[in-house]
From Swiss-Prot:
Cofactor note: Binds 1 Fe(2+) ion per subunit.
InterPro entries with a match to the protein in the record: Oxoglu/Fe-dep_dioxygenase_dom (IPR005123), PKHD_C (IPR041097), PKHD_hydroxylase (IPR023550), Pro_4_hyd_alph (IPR006620), Pro_4_hyd_alph_FE2OG_OXY (IPR044862)
Domain Fe2OG dioxygenase: 78-178
One Pfam assignment: 2OG-FeII_Oxy_3
Residue pairs linked by disulfide bridges in the UniProt entry: none
Keyword terms of this UniProt record: Dioxygenase, Iron, Metal-binding, Oxidoreductase, Vitamin C
Positions annotated to bind Fe cation: 96, 98, 159
Cofactor(s) this protein requires: Fe(2+); L-ascorbate
E.C. designation(s): 1.14.11.-
Residues noted as binding 2-oxoglutarate in the record, renumbered to the chain: 169
Protein's name in the database: PKHD-type hydroxylase Mpe_A3725
Taxonomic lineage: Bacteria, Pseudomonadati, Pseudomonadota, Betaproteobacteria, Burkholderiales
GO molecular function: 2-oxoglutarate-dependent dioxygenase activity; iron ion binding; L-ascorbic acid binding
Organism: Methylibium petroleiphilum (strain ATCC BAA-1232 / LMG 22953 / PM1)
Top EC category: oxidoreductase
Length: 226
């Protein structure tokens, strides 16, 4: 399931993050990938242990955990601290797939990458090119969202970033291990949860809504790994 999650950050939060990012030092993005990724990656990133990056990442994680759409879709168990990248002057990232397991920088923890997220910190009018292109079983999808919005997609998807030919594209990106490993099961739970919320708005907590809520939690109880 691929999902647009709007307004993860407010405009003021985006502006503050961009101000701080623009004042810090960036490194060659190839330093954070293996030999295969390094052949197709051309961008800059904040160092994984950057104090500024860690602080800004905490701001993003706090916003995610109170965003009902993200929580409903991802059912997050653990999330790698958000990283930050920057593309300009023709920089790009060729077709690749994310690694199945990620280490949490500065710790001995590892997590399974079920879901990948890109949080846009530049508006579409600020740059040309730079589309995130995701290839899945349903086709090829080009993504270019307003600053503060996020795209969530399965980490099993091939994807690339098109060359940025004008301006600067700044994003945060990270991976989440879901409580529900299987994408199909997670999609079913998401749609059921969204329908329950809509029915509750119309009908309140009537017996049928309570029954559906019970079915949701029983399915989650059956499939969740915590």
């Amino acid at each position: 399931m691929m999902l647009h999650v709007p307004e993860v950050l407010t405009r003021d939060q985006v502006a503050d993050i961009r101000t701080r990012l623009d004042a810090t030092d960036w490194v060659d993005g190839r330093a954070t990938v293996g030999p295969q990724g390094a052949q197709v990656k051309q961008n800059r990133q904040l160092p994984e242990l950057s104090p500024v990056g860690r602080e800004l990442g905490e701001t993003i994680l706090k916003a995610l955990l109170v965003h009902p759409l993200f929580v409903s879709a991802a059912l997050p168990l653990r999330t790698v601290p958000p990283l930050f990248n920057r593309y300009e002057g023709g920089e790009h990232y060729g077709l690749h797939i994310d690694g199945a397991v990620r280490s949490v920088p500065g710790t001995h923890l590892r997590l399974r990458t079920d879901l990948s997220s890109t949080l846009f910190l530049s508006d579409p009018d600020d740059y040309d090119g730079g589309e995130l292109v995701v290839v899945d079983t349903y086709g090829t999808h080009e993504v270019k969202l307003p600053a503060g919005d996020l795209i969530l997609y399965p980490s099993t998807s091939l994807h690339r970033v098109e060359p940025v030919t004008r301006g600067t594209r700044v994003c945060s990106f990270f991976w989440t291990q879901s409580m529900v490993r299987d994408d199909g099961q997670r999609h079913l739970l998401f749609e059921l949860d969204q329908d329950i919320q809509k029915l509750r708005e119309k009908l309140g907590d009537c017996p049928e809504v309570l029954s559906l809520t019970g079915h949701y939690h029983n399915l989650l109880r059956q499939w969740a790994e915590v």
